[in-house]
Amino acid sequence: MNSARAKRIDIISDTHGYLSPALLDELKGADLIIHAGDLTSEMDYEHLCTIAPVRAVLGNNDYYRDYGPDVDRLALFTYEGLKFAVAHYREDLPVGSVDVAINGHTHVTKEAQVGRCLVLNPGSASYPRGTRGPTMARMLVKDGKILSTNFIDLE
């Protein structure tokens, strides 16, 4: 491993066809973008792919025909030595077998440690629920370790 620098992962969900200027500005410089479902726009997916590599999953408002075979209901992958699982619904995540489990759907931020697994919901970057405005999450990783995780308010 021994990468030269920490990698920045920007984590978003539930954009529902709207990528705000504030969100697009925050995503500049990301090494990887993770989208936890409900993109609802093929053009938005293509736009995100011009910013950084994207790992995305289908939400309850997405359809297979929109994004092709690389986007499914569950994404399992290793990045910088960490095992990731991404699904729109929390109950679809194999929390016991990964280092980081990411979900969306609730439009509310949440971070919890479950055993050795960090479970993260970035909230909604476009249509939040609850008292917090639009949000995303940012994670810095290097050599199999999470260096930091934080939520970013997009207002």
Regions found by a protein language model. Name each.
Residues 1-8, 13, 138-155:
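Acidic, histidine-bearing metal-coordination/catalytic regions of metal-dependent phosphoesterases
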Residues 1-54, 62-73, 132-135:
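N-terminal active-site segment of His-dependent metallophosphoesterases
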Residues 13-17, 37-39, 60-62, 89-91, ...:
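Active-site metal-binding loops of divalent metal-dependent hydrolases
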Residues 35, 59, 142-144:
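Juxtamembrane helix-loop transition sites at the ends of transmembrane segments
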Residues 55, 78-149:
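Conserved beta-sheet core of the metallophosphoesterase superfamily
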